[in-house]
Amino acid sequence: MSKIYLKVPNIHELYYRQEWMKDLKTMSYNSGYDMDLKGYNKQTGTITRTDEEMITWYNNWINKEPDRYFAYIYDKDIEEPIGEVYYYLNNDVHSMGILIQNKYRGKGYSYISLLELEKIAFEKNGINELSDIIPLDRMNTIKSFKKAGFIHTDLEQKELVFGKESIAKQLLITREMYMEMR
């Protein structure tokens, strides 16, 4: 696999994120949830944002380290970003996420991108942990997180997805765990 790197976008690169959020295949994992989020379509999982809303989002998210970080994922052999990673402080825990554009899924990008995010979070920004809550039926996602050093904790959430109960569990990696792996 080619070299992966993370790059914080400039304001003129917001259209990538805006397009991914509208893409049915990229956002299909997000469908069925009862989210109170402006622009969210429960049937498709897509999220629609105006240009003005994207600029407001950008001003709230970009260059807010160490508590908030957002970057695009790049493969040096591909001219445009293939996805995004982020984390943010949420009740004393840094919640995080990763999104790979649909056409690049299944190629190992998640694992390598998680390693890059860990390096920035723990080595550059000195945060103590990264955490995500992932539905147990997303086996490939869980596999990538565990390969990158995350472990399941006892914290779980039950959510309704299209009226059916879904269980999601926390995956967590601490700075100490990260340092022991390196």
Regions found by a protein language model. Name each.
Residues 37-67:
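Active-site rim helix/loop that mediates acceptor-substrate recognition in acyltransferases
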